[in-house]
Amino acid sequence: MLVFSATFTAKPGAAQAVIDLVATLIEPSRAEPGCIRYDFLQSPYTPNQFVFFELWKSQADLDAHFQEPHFLAFAERLPALTEGSFEKVAYETDGPKPAA
């Protein structure tokens, strides 16, 4: 399995536009083959700070996600609403484990 996160910052005044844009992405992404979890989070402390937190069966599934029409449409529009860089991180895991 692959854990993936992408953190980014909306331009001042653009947080709601980001939320509205992401709303078009969530359900189709969750329905994709290989998607185990797909969450979009907004910081309660810095409202312009957002993160995608995702769990995929494989790197191939994540790569396929990035080629889906709904993702490509989203990716085309998002840069106009954000500032700074995107922090992307991925980790391989063999799945959730119970807490000790």
Map each language-model feature to its residues.
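Short alpha-helical
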Residues: 13, 47, 69, 73, ...
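N-terminal first-folded block
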Residues: 2-40
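An amphipathic, aromatic/His-enriched active-site/gating alpha helix that lines ligand/cofactor pockets
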Residues: 20, 24, 28-36, 55-89
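Glycine-rich beta-strand-turn "strand-cap" elements at beta-sheet edges
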Residues: 40-45, 76-100
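Short, well-ordered beta-strand segments in beta-rich or mixed alpha/beta enzyme
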Residues: 2-8, 39-66
